[in-house]
Amino acid sequence: MSILVDKNTTFMVQGITGREAVNLTRECLDYGSKIVGGVTPGRAGRDIYGVPVYDCVRDVIARHGPVHGSVISVPPGFTRDAAFEAIENGVKLIVIVTENIPRQEVAQMVELASLRGARIIGPNCLGLITPGECKMGGIGGPAANTKQAYTRGPIGIMSRSGGMTTEIASTLTAAGLGQSTAVSIGGDAIIGTSYAELMPYFEADPETQAIAIYSEPGGRMEAELAEWVTTNKS
């Protein structure tokens, strides 16, 4: 099993015609991820590596049906509106790769996601991956590199640093220890999902036997995680 994403996960890319989004779209497709559509207002009718582009999230869903997730790669000033659009159209998993978003706007996105039963990963993250099944975001880089670093197995990964997420996976793989799911949670002060919020997912996953965590100084997330582990005797 896995957490959050698997071989059946479908997602869109908001801001798909931007340079970074074009790259991550190709990397995800090459890995085998199921990107059903992209969104860039005013660019409907184009395609990016065979992925059709639409003017809005609603149009993607109208054409392809319900979509599990969205990767948002738009300028900071447009990120909140993009996230709101995805959430209000029923998208439940949102990966925000954009950085330098005002904290107040991040807080507003996280609040709306909570109210609507959606989950945000990021901002300022590389996304997440279930090895051999699906990756959302630029995590791992090109497909060949991703397949070399990430292999299927019993270790979950949570990391503030996108680069260290892959470094940890590579080290584990070299030691013969594959990964269930790896999540780059984001390096900003305010993010959508903390270590403690991911723990119940890993705890409920029978495939995950241990978790590797990479943290960075500052914030309360580590203390919250310790409290969760103590309370739940994990």
Protein language model regions, located:
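Catalytic-core regions of core metabolic enzymes
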Residues: 1-234
